Amino acid sequence: MGTILDKIVDQKKKEVAALYETYTPVKEKRKTRSLVKALEQFTVIAEVKRASPSKGDINLHVDVRKQVKTYEECGAGAVSVLTDGQFFKGSFYDLQTAREESSIPLLCKDFIIDKIQIDRAYEAGADIILLIVAALTKEKLKELYSYVLEKGLEAIVEVHDEQELEIAIQLNPHVIGINNRNLKTFEVDLSQTEKLGKRLNEEKLLWISESGIHSKEDIIRVKRAGAKGVLVGEALMTSSSIHTFFEDCKVNI
């Protein structure tokens, strides 16, 4: 029986095949916004996340324009948009809507396995592409990372364990994302940030913490580990006061 990640990647293969049948990439170049620059100070990458395999529906009918505008007003350094439809109920339309509303860097959060998905994200307005080590062979990861650079975009290369981290370090990527969620089981363990963060601090690489960040205490914990930013979805999508969450992120260590 396959893992959740296996099921997602199988679905992505079908979507990629459909894209090759129905989508022609645009040739025009455009200006992009830099996450690396935003991470010069501690940054919240605030996510638009309608649903997930682990939580089910989170905020299914969110007004993307309103949510993104609130994030930017509260001081988000970047916005992440889930574009997966089958498991997270997002879309490239959500990404495009966020681009129309936002002037800060925009991350396409999806399970990218092929260049044509990067083309589609670029057209929808993405500045940053998520590349998940667990979903790719070493060769495919290298190929897609090179293509991200070719498009003038930045990448977050996502890892969960030591083995994936060593693969990511070889790329010397713009940003490494430590995902506290195991994509095979979808269980969350914030100590992954502390374990892997030590190695990244030694390498002097730029990195962020992803998943399982819900409170001021969590923010303090990942800041102490050396993270330059956090990617937060569920906590913001269910928050009664997004402003308060952002205020908590300003705590000094």
From Swiss-Prot:
Entry's transmembrane regions: none
GO biological process: L-tryptophan biosynthetic process
Pathway stated in the Swiss-Prot or TrEMBL entry: Amino-acid biosynthesis; L-tryptophan biosynthesis; L-tryptophan from chorismate: step 4/5
Catalysis performed (reactions): 1-(2-carboxyphenylamino)-1-deoxy-D-ribulose 5-phosphate + H(+) = (1S,2R)-1-C-(indol-3-yl)glycerol 3-phosphate + CO2 + H2O
Molecular function terms, GO-annotated: indole-3-glycerol-phosphate synthase activity; phosphoribosylanthranilate isomerase activity
Top-level lineage group: Bacteria
NCBIfam families: PRK00278.1-3, PRK00278.2-4
Keyword Amino-acid biosynthesis appears in the UniProt entry: yes
Protein family according to the UniProt entry: Belongs to the TrpC family.
Pfam families: IGPS (PF00218)
Designated name of the protein: Indole-3-glycerol phosphate synthase
InterPro entries: Aldolase_TIM, Indole-3-glycerol_P_synth, Indole-3-glycerol_P_synth_dom, Indole-3-GlycerolPSynthase_CS, RibuloseP-bd_barrel
Keyword annotations: Amino-acid biosynthesis, Aromatic amino acid biosynthesis, Decarboxylase, Lyase, Tryptophan biosynthesis
Matching HAMAP family: IGPS_B
EC number(s) per entry: 4.1.1.48
